[in-house]
Amino acid sequence: MTNPMQATRKIISITDQNVVHREDQVAREYPLTIYVNDREFATMVCTQADLEEMVIGFLGSEGLIRFYKQDVASLSIDESRGFAYVSLTKELPTEWQFYSKRMIGSCCGKSRQSFYFHNDAKTAKTSMSRTTMTPEQCFRLMEALQEQSVIFQQTGGVHNAALATPEQMLISRTDIGRHNALDKLYGYCLMNGVPVRDKVLLFSGRISSEVLLKAAKIGVGIMLSKSAPTELALTMAEELNITTAGFIRDGRMNIYTVPERILTPKKEVQ
């Protein structure tokens, strides 16, 4: 049976001493075109898994869905043709065709100017989370994410994201697209009524501005990554009151924004 998430390819592996012909695993790409109320809305190139969650999470992050049961009349996916059909209980906003357009807007009414999609100022949430955690909990959660990253270990070609409490990881999702992995998590939360304000977001890739915005739209207050952030992402995190920590590996980490949610040791070295 064909694995929809990865494929086997014959490759030539070269080192400084050897040339080896062998088989290797590579991640598959799957295009999915989303229709909303019979109108073509977006095409996403993704990993063919958890597609319903991804569609719902994407529409939620675009501001079209707030409550799954109230806002979605029907959802069906034709995986053989690569189409998703969503019927909403309300009409599309008149400005829906501009949702994918880049524009410059201010964050939550502040004067600082940052790059946002058309509707980001309305859908990005300023975090009011009171969740706190220790560095040791951060290390354990990131180790758990790594252990769950089976497809990445086999292919090296996907991103992993997870939702957790400070004590344990709750759910993880995988995709070739970093945004898609986050949309899958958000979709799961919307479809299952999972509260997110007290949760922690774990991520395998860098924290870019668009990734940070996804976290804000999901509604978490803490985002942990094994990789680096960008300067614009940190500016947004400060404005949205989101704690960001990166380079979490080998018992080390960097805290970039809103550090009071990470309970650091009292002894500090200047």
From Swiss-Prot:
Compartment list: Cytoplasm
Domain of life: Bacteria
Family: Belongs to the FdhD family.
Function: Required for formate dehydrogenase (FDH) activity. Acts as a sulfur carrier protein that transfers sulfur from IscS to the molybdenum cofactor prior to its insertion into FDH.
Any one GO BP annotation for this protein: Mo-molybdopterin cofactor biosynthetic process
Residues the record marks as active site: 108 (cysteine persulfide intermediate)
The keyword Cytoplasm is annotated on this UniProt entry: yes
Any Gene Ontology CC annotation: cytoplasm
Matches recorded under InterPro entries: Cytidine_deaminase-like, FdhD
Residues reported in the UniProt entry to bind Mo-bis(molybdopterin guanine dinucleotide): 247-252
Organism: Halalkalibacterium halodurans (strain ATCC BAA-125 / DSM 18197 / FERM 7344 / JCM 9153 / C-125) (Bacillus halodurans)
Keywords: Cytoplasm, Molybdenum cofactor biosynthesis
One MF annotation (Gene Ontology) recorded for this entry: sulfurtransferase activity
Official protein name in the record: Sulfur carrier protein FdhD
Underlying gene: fdhD
